[in-house]
Amino acid sequence: RCNLACKYCVGNWSARKINDFTMDELKKVIDECKGLGTVHFTIHGGEILLRNDTKEIIDYLKGNGMYVNLVTNGILLPEKIDDVVDVDSLCISLDGREENNDYNRGKGTYKAVMAAIKIAREKKLKFVVHATLTKRSIEDVEYLCEQAKEMNYYQQFSLLLKPLTARQEDQDLGLTDEEARDTMRKLIELKDKGYPIFTFYPTLRNVINWPFNLSKSRLNRDEIPANADLINCYYGKLKISIDADGFAYPCSSLNDSFDALNVKEVGVRRAFDHIIKTNNCEACYYLTQNDWSLLLGGSMNQFINQAYIQAKGVFKRS
């Protein structure tokens, strides 16, 4: 479920009518994940803060020794802040200046998210701010990075190449191939100037050097050119995505195409084994996924990069 209706939403969460996990079902999934060696758990949506048991979920995850990252649109964060103070990290969504953010995400969301950022800072929580880059928000990239520098947090980005809704009026939101690659070059320039951009250099270069038009966002094993220098994907090998309806995917970008099993029906282990055996997706240019794949693949530079970011967050809270 979600309390917003962002124009580019991949899940159409605000219109979904599925039954979410019960607390008992979630605890069973968490127990199974722990048994498989899980140490990091990201809670995302939809909007998790619509639930009344978010604190109980976080407490159960922390009690099982897991690092907990929570993704929120920020609207309910000020009133639910006491429920999330024990997470290890937060991700709050903001797409740009008020006009462009509210065009993408709904009227009034900019002011609400700025209030969420304010209270996260007051509580000394470790958080990043995430922006989806659309035709409207690419003009605000420097603004977002400047604000992150002033307010002492990291700015994260993802790319929208085409709208993921059927609404005809939203079809102009996606970036062209040229706009996307040029924006990655701009982010590299800003990182070089010291702006706190979470997205890692190799991830940004991976978009610039993508061997196909960016309308082709994912590659199966037999589609990767022999001389291509792409980031190896570890989604579906060391990391999976479980939807609110229980279906388990290699990653959320495949929820419209992968033949998934449901953890409520077959359990996490069998659903994970099915992913390992049948997933054929090997590379993409998605920013968050490739930042993760560098870490999971043992990139020493990414380990150092993340250790620095995590250490800054620890000192912020102390």
Residue ranges and their predicted role:
Residues 1-83, 306, 318:
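Conserved alpha-helical substructure of the radical SAM core
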Residues 1-13, 17, 31-35, 204-228, ...:
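N-terminal pre-core extensions flanking Radical SAM catalytic domains
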Residues 5, 37-38, 86, 151-154, ...:
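Short loop/turn motifs at secondary-structure junctions
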Residues 13, 45, 94, 159, ...:
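Residues that line or immediately flank small-molecule/substrate-binding pockets and catalytic motifs
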Residues 21, 64-67, 88-89, 93-95, ...:
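Radical SAM enzyme [4Fe-4S]-AdoMet core and its adjacent flexible, acidic
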Residues 78, 99-100:
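A short, histidine- and acid-enriched strand-loop-helix "catalytic/donor-clamping" loop
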Residues 227-234, 245-318:
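Flexible mid-to-C-terminal extensions adjoining Fe-S/redox cofactors in radical SAM and related proteins
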